[in-house]
Amino acid sequence: MGLRKGLLVAGACAALMGLSAAPASAKDLVIHAGRLIDGTGKPVRTQVSILVHDDRIVSVDAGYTTPSGAEVIDLSGSTVLPGLIDDHVHITQSFHKGDPIHTAMTRTSFDDEIDAVVNARNTLMAGFTSARDVGGDTQVVVALKNAIKGGLIPGPRLWVAGTPLGPTGGHGDAANGLDPELEHPGWT
């Protein structure tokens, strides 16, 4: 396995270690890591056991050790690193092909929610265990955050801003670029 692929796999596993789709439980988990980049700037450590209790890392020990009753994830052939944090995401957005005006006029918050569920899983699998959503439909992002926190769907731990604020015609105005002939009396 190449270094890039190994880091990607390890990042995803580290993400799953920090936040899984299941709610926190008292069960212990141990990860046998072939290589550990701990994020402190120290040299890479080899052949370590990472003990996780209640979704939190409680120790990193030299060698492959397994406490009694712990579930083992064998990453002895992989590189593991801490979960990453993305501090600027729009988790409900997806860039669809086709006419952007048509998309803006026909998409609903339900479409955004479906995209958000897919994007949350993809974000987690890319190694990001925490993300800050800086603008999206408030009901959608709060529901997504709660579903992840409750273990209903996989995704990173989320901090959400809700619907972005801005001046009419400014950044974040969904009506930007629309033909004036498409105006609706209820929009003013």
What positions do the PLM features span?
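General beta-strand structural signal in soluble alpha/beta enzymes
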Residues: 73, 132-133, 160
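Metal-associated gating/positioning segment near the N- to mid-region
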Residues: 79-152, 168
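Bacterial N-terminal signal peptides
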Residues: 9-18
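Histidine-rich, glycine-flanked metal-binding segment
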Residues: 36, 40-81
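N-terminal secretory signal peptides that target proteins for export/translocation
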Residues: 1-5
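Metal-coordinating catalytic core of metallo-dependent amide/deamination hydrolases
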Residues: 152-188
